[in-house]
């Protein structure tokens, strides 16, 4: 068989009641207990059947032998696209099998072809005079409409990425001109023409105003950590976009500030001053590279343009201690900052954690998981939002440990642990499994779990509650406890993203992407099916559930104070509870 062949599972082809739909020759019903293959060569003339295993006896029910799911197993990119176009219906709603195949293809096509390749292939299918030399003239507009339907679905899925791709913009203009030329010969294309006029209109508005800064799936935040090469972003950064800015207070601790890219130093300093409870006029910001060079930021300096280096950090320092590299020591005064949390309502605090996590989770494009999995670098220009949610999970874990270990008084520390157990329970109740896992892992951090004096004073009912919460994080049986509990939760809900990525990675590493020079589309279907978990979780929207009077609480959650050094955390742990 040639390299252009396509291999598919088609359980419907062998049903007795659909025999008339087959070719002229009768094919016997195979007695297979697993789905079987149909090979389609380039001319689509010969059929060859095979199976991975055979059953010794034939089941009485055809339905019990054959899956209802229609699955493309493998093929060249061109043949997969051709098969997809053949199967598309022009009705408003596709059948389930075709809809799944279309969604699988659109979610994963970048694995085996570039966007430019896809655009060129679609143009060829649209402009072909005759399809494989056997198309009736009456079928031409139908084929064109199928191509346009696929394009519209592609645009709907990638509406926030396509305007940044030059190949896509050129393709949309070209196919629009083709439809404009064809509509006189085929008036039935008028509906598609109007749709493309709307699409091109939206793209023009995107060029002018980048849509709304609040639009879904746009990169709402960008990592701004000098420790990790500062800024990671997708496409051109605009002044309306926001960043995660780490402002270091000591060598191992920082305040995480959410601010616009266009923010000046004075605006960021105001947030930091409020967080660390110092007078703004007594503080200043300085950019310090790892080579030791310092650059003091003036009030009106743009933070990014003035301090964007390959490596380094932004520090806040007291003006009266300008010559000190780390002007804020972890002294008794800094330790007392942890006491603020004891006065906060645990449900409201969990609610703010959920709001923040949802803003990140709701901004993740489904294909970010594909890029993250297939890119050896892990995070890049197409995974900004996903990387930020993963970073947030890590920060919440560090925040829990930081708050507990900065509390030197045993009684207060016991209250803090109880507080975090309650917050974790509320996160579970609010269906925010990302922060739930992070808090439980923070309480189980070695530097916290070793605090025997603290844990001994935790009341029995809290220990029991924490044990129940811990059981959901049990990794045994492939995280069965978590999966069962999460499956029962109704959307909207936030999954534990590292585990979802683990699932996609497991499929990727356990299956070859190409088999005999053909795209292993069965693997891509499994990946797409897992990625669709995001879509299910976002079936409904949380919205902003924060009362206006929670602004202080919201500011606290948005700008967490964390110590990011495990060594520093262990030193604090041994300081408050020395080894006996």
Curated annotation (Swiss-Prot):
Looking up Gene3D superfamilies in the UniProt record yields:
Phosphatidylinositol 3-kinase Catalytic Subunit, Chain A, domain 1 (3.10.20.90), Ras guanine-nucleotide exchange factors catalytic domain (1.10.840.10), Son of sevenless (SoS) protein Chain: S domain 1 (1.20.870.10)
Can you tell which superkingdom this protein's organism belongs to? Eukaryota
Ranges for domain Ras-GEF: 345-579
Tissue specificity, in the record's words, reads:
Widely expressed with highest levels in brain.
Output the PROSITE patterns linked to this UniProt entry. RASGEF, RASGEF_CAT, RASGEF_NTER
Cited CDD domains = RasGEF (cd00155), REM (cd06224)
Q: Which GO terms describe its cellular component?
A: nuclear body; nucleoplasm; nucleus; plasma membrane
A single GO BP:
nervous system development
* UniProt keyword rRNA processing present: no
Q: Where in the cell is it found?
A: Nucleus
Q: Which SUPFAM superfamilies match?
A: Ras GEF, Ubiquitin-like
For this protein, the record's Pfam families field holds: RasGEF (PF00617), RasGEF_N (PF00618)
Coiled coil ranges: none
The alphabetical list of record keywords is: Guanine-nucleotide releasing factor, Nucleus
Name all N-terminal Ras-GEF domain ranges. Answer: 68-201
Cited function: Guanine nucleotide exchange factor (GEF) for RAP1A, RAP2A and MRAS/M-Ras-GTP. Its association with MRAS inhibits Rap1 activation.
Q: What is this protein called?
A: Rap guanine nucleotide exchange factor 5
- This protein's species is Homo sapiens (Human)
List the lineage, top down: Eukaryota, Metazoa, Chordata, Craniata, Vertebrata
């Amino acid at each position: 068989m040639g390299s252009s062949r396509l291999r598919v599972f088609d359980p419907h082809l062998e049903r007795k009641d659909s025999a008339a739909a087959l070719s002229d020759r009768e094919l016997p019903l195979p007695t297979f207990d697993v789905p079987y293959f149909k090979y389609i060569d380039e001319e689509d003339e010969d059929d060859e059947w095979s199976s991975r295993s055979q059953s010794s006896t034939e089941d009485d029910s055809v339905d019990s032998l054959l899956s209802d799911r229609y699955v493309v197993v493998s093929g060249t990119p061109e043949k997969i696209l051709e098969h997809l176009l053949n199967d598309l219906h022009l009705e408003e709603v596709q059948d389930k099998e075709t809809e799944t195949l279309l969604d699988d293809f659109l979610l994963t096509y970048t694995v085996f072809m570039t966007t430019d390749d896809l655009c060129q292939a679609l143009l060829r299918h649209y402009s072909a005079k005759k399809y494989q030399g056997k198309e009736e003239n009456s079928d031409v507009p139908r084929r064109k409409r199928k191509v346009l339907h696929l394009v519209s679905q592609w645009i709907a899925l990638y509406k926030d990425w396509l305007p940044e791709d030059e190949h896509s913009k050129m393709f949309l203009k070209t196919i629009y001109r083709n439809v404009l030329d064809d509509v006189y010969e085929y008036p039935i294309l008028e509906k598609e023409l109007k749709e493309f006029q709307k699409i091109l209109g939206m793209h023009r508005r995107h060029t002018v105003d980048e849509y709304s800064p609040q639009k879904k799936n746009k990169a709402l935040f960008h990592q701004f950590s000098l420790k990790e090469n500062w800024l990671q972003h997708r496409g051109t950064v605009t002044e309306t976009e926001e960043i995660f800015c780490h402002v270091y207070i000591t060598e191992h601790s920082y305040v995480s500030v959410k601010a616009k890219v266009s923010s000046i130093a004075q605006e960021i300093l105001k947030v930091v001053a409020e967080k660390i409870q110092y007078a703004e006029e007594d503080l200043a910001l300085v950019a310090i590279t790892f080579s030791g060079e310092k650059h003091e930021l003036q009030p009106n300096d743009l933070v990014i343009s003035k301090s964007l280096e390959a490596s380094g950090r932004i520090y806040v320092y007291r003006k009266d201690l300008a010559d000190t590299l780390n002007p804020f020591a972890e002294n008794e005064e800094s330790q007392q900052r942890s006491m603020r949390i004891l006065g906060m309502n645990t449900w409201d605090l969990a609610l703010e954690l959920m709001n923040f996590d949802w803003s990140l989770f709701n901004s993740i494009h489904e294909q970010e998981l594909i890029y993250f999995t297939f890119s050896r670098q892990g995070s890049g220009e197409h995974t900004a939002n996903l990387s930020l949610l993963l970073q947030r999970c890590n920060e919440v874990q560090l925040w829990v440990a930081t708050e507990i270990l900065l509390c030197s008084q045993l009684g207060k520390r016991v209250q803090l642990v109880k507080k975090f157990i309650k917050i974790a329970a509320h996160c579970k109740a609010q269906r925010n499994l990302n922060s739930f896992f992070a808090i439980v892992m923070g309480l189980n951090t070695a530097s916290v779990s070793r605090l025997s004096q603290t844990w001994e004073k935790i009341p029995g009912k809290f220990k029991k509650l924490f044990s129940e919460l811990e059981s959901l994080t049990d990794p045994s049986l492939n995280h069965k406890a978590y999966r069962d509990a999460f499956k029962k939760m109704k959307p909207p809900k936030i999954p534990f993203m590292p585990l979802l990525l683990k699932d996609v990675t497991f499929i990727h590493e356990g299956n070859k992407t190409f088999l005999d020079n053909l795209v292993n589309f069965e693997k891509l279907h499994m990946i797409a099916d897992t990625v669709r978990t995001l879509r299910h979780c976002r079936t409904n929207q949380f919205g902003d559930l924060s009362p206006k009077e929670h602004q202080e609480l919201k500011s606290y959650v948005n700008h967490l104070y964390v110590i990011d050094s495990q060594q520093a955390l262990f030193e604090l742990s041994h300081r408050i509870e020395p080894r006996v």
